Amino acid sequence: MRTNFSSPRGPLVRRDPRGLPRNHPLPAWTSHSFHTHAVDLSVDPVTGEVSINRYVVAQDVGFAINPTYIEGQIEGGVAQGIGQALSEEIVYDGGRVLNANLTDYKMPTMLDMPRVECILIEKPSVNGPYGAKGVGEPPCIQPPAAIANAIAVATGVRVQTLPITAEKIALARLEDSD
């Protein structure tokens, strides 16, 4: 993909040999995200209700410019991931949304959140400003997989669709016992 940065009078943006704007304080950059999530949870054997007892995230953050802010980003990402894993669902029928409003879209609240233990691993990036890496998006990715695997270990059954609700767990246990 190419972008044109010119006008009839010449280039609008002067570029260095790598194609980056010259003297730009923060040119676009990428760095790989390395992180792991561990979750300790329990599943009620009768209702299938999931309770998260402990949630731990270890994430390579490059250089931690503001560790408290980074922990907040990780906690927010984990909250999004827990919602994806356990409660958030948009129901469709033939392309039509059946959720009447957002009260039917169950996002986790602070009362639903476990304490998230953050382990910040600092391995500065050569690409990021001051060696920092992006920290906001990566924590959203792992929670559904970590929670699904922990539920499978706790119950002996694997639910294949998100969100993993108490009803889906109970049905999977019934099917497994047949």
Q: Where do the language-model regions lie?
A:
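C-terminal catalytic domains of large/alpha subunits in multi-subunit enzymes
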Residues: 1-178
